[in-house]
């Protein structure tokens, strides 16, 4: 379960930010996760609760914001949202697409005190 190691990375970032900005508690942590990031959200939620014990984010509410998949179509030159990596271009039906978004995961923001 790589979600555990993802949460360990989040814990490190939270700790760094707590020291840098002087907060003691994270109330809400918002993550943006792309459609193609390969993250199992239920497993991430479980791992988050376990890994954050003893940190500034212990007991924090985790909110996950879904980011769409995006691709550049080499046939029409446009960028469009796609549901699956192998979908045709929704604008022109072309099949030569390069994914340009949807594989990211990042902390959007935190509510702290």
Curated annotation (Swiss-Prot):
One of its GO terms (molecular function) is zinc ion binding. Keywords: Metal-binding, Nickel, Zinc. GO terms for biological process: protein maturation; protein modification process. Zn(2+) binds at residues 73, 76, 89, 92. It comes from the Bacteria. Belongs to the HypA/HybF family. This is Hydrogenase maturation factor HypA. The gene is hypA.
